[in-house]
Structure formats: structure tokens, C-alpha cells
A protein has these predicted regions:
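Residues at the starts of beta-strands that form the adenosine-phosphate
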Residues: 29, 52-54, 120, 145
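Adenosine-nucleotide cofactor-binding segment
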Residues: 32-35, 47-110
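C-terminal hydrophobic helical "lid"/dimerization subdomain
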Residues: 81, 93, 109-113, 117, ...
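Rossmann-fold dehydrogenase core element
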Residues: 119-122, 134-176
């Protein structure tokens, strides 16, 4: 039951953004910025969608290692230089789909900058109210797109049973997201930890 709770928010948001908002196609190239729960769910969703290359980007090495478990084919540590340049080195011309799962101005701009001509950047992270992102206007001549995603554009009646089936088939990684189980009486201590 505790794993089912994960589907209700983070997994639905990440996998749904891949399936519904961006509609990632088999064989495509994907980059995910931010490897927390939603970012890992994007990576898992991209693998389920049949993406040919999935690039995980984060600044925490342990999160990048976990991203491999969820389906990342390549990892980029943001501490090692410009992630946009690193994505371009790996792909030649950028990715077809990028997902921003942090909620920062800089990472939203990077998500747009790392897509190739005709690519789509999907911003999932909650950028603070009043913050504006800046994009190069000429990039739109290359038919690049940027969009937001709210709860993965979910369709709960269809998605929930489908995600449960993926989990039962060993394709949706929920167990790996649970780092520790605690009793309700210990919740305050868990927040401190």
C-alpha cells in the first residue's frame, strides 16, 4: 500500500509528463534535469516509452547512480561543466525531449537550450511565482517548443490501473523509491533526519 501512495503524485507527474504531455516516441532521445522522485519517474517513463537514449542530469552522484536503475543510459554531473554542452557532446545536435524536474530559472532555460531542432522541452518543476525565464527568440525558427506539465497531464482512471500493471510486471520502479519506512508516531523525527 505504501508503494501505491507514490503513484498518486510523483510517479503520475513524471511518467505522465513523458506519456501524455510530451508523448515521447520509441527510439527518441531524452534528457531529464533533476533526479529526485519526479525526475526518476520521468526516466522510468522514458524507458517504458521505448526511448533510445535517456540522459540523467543532476549534481548529486548517488542520485545519478539511482537514475541508472530507473533506465538512464547516460549520466551527467552538473558539477562537471555546462550540462547543455555535455548533452550536445553526447548527441551531436541535442535531444528530442527534455524534462526539467527542479523548478529553477537556470534549469528551465537549460532544458530549452539542450533540445535539437523540432524538440520539446517540458517544464515540470515549480518555478517560483514572478520568476521569468529567458529564451533566445531565434530558436523558435527551428520549431523548438517549450511547455509546462501539471500532474503529468494525468488521466487517473486510465493511468492508475496502467501504472499498477507496470509495477506488478516489474517495469515501474516503486520499491527503489522507498528509502526507509517509519511509523506515524515517528514522523517529526523523520523530517529532522
Amino acid at each position: 500500500l505504501d508503494r501505491a501512495a507514490l503513484i498518486g503524485c510523483g510517479v503520475t507527474t513524471g511518467v505522465g509528463a513523458v506519456f501524455h504531455t510530451a508523448a515521447v516516441e520509441p527510439g527518441s532521445t531524452v534528457a531529464v534535469i533533476g533526479c529526485g522522485g519526479i525526475g526518476l519517474s520521468c526516466i522510468n517513463g522514458a524507458a517504458l516509452a521505448g526511448a533510445g537514449r535517456i540522459i540523467a542530469i543532476d549534481m548529486v552522484e548517488s542520485k545519478l547512480e539511482m537514475a541508472k536503475t530507473f533506465g538512464a543510459t547516460d549520466i551527467i554531473n552538473g558539477n562537471d561543466g555546462d550540462p547543455v554542452e555535455q548533452v550536445r557532446e553526447l548527441t551531436g545536435d541535442g535531444v528530442q525531449y527534455s524534462f526539467e524536474a527542479i523548478g529553477l530559472k537556470q534549469t528551465a532555460e537549460q532544458a530549452f537550450s539542450m533540445i535539437r531542432a523540432g524538440g520539446t522541452a517540458t517544464i515540470i518543476g515549480m518555478i517560483p511565482v514572478g520568476v521569468k525565464i529567458e529564451l533566445m527568440g531565434a530558436a523558435f525558427l527551428q520549431e523548438k517548443k517549450i511547455q509546462g506539465s501539471m500532474m503529468g497531464s494525468n488521466r487517473f482512471r486510465v493511468d492508475m490501473p496502467r501504472f499498477i500493471d507496470f509495477y506488478l510486471a516489474g517495469k515501474l520502479h516503486l520499491d527503489e523509491m522507498v528509502s526507509k519506512r517509519i511509523g506515524l508516531a515517528d514522523i517529526n523525527e523523520a523530517f529532522v533526519d
